[in-house]
Amino acid sequence: MSNVCTIAWIYGRVQGVGFRYTTQHEAQRLGLTGYAKNMDDGSVEVVACGDEAQVEKLIKWLKEGGPRSARVDKILTEPHSPHETLTDFSIRY
């Protein structure tokens, strides 16, 4: 498999419920780099880079609702070319 980067915007009850923290934990478990960031519109932006199959697993996990305390109503994804080198998976503020 090849390495890819995907950017996702997750909408629903995804802020104030530990969404970024649990996304970081899941991404690290899958060996991915990138970040999770709360957006002003109430969504969460996630950039995930790594092995294509592992990125797909994270996106599937996000679509299934992520952490139990969250409620995902909609997720949009597209290929992404980061403007920086991502060496780990972080929470951004």
Curated annotation (Swiss-Prot):
SUPFAM superfamilies tied to this protein: Acylphosphatase/BLUF domain-like (SSF54975)
Enzyme class, first EC level, given as a word: hydrolase
Keywords per UniProt: Disulfide bond, Hydrolase
Gene Ontology MF terms in the entry: acylphosphatase activity
Catalytic reactions on record: an acyl phosphate + H2O = a carboxylate + phosphate + H(+)
Catalytic residues (UniProt): 20, 38
Entry keyword Transferase: no
Disulfide bonds: 5-49
EC number of the protein: 3.6.1.7
Protein name: Acylphosphatase
Organism: Salmonella arizonae (strain ATCC BAA-731 / CDC346-86 / RSK2980)
Originating gene: yccX
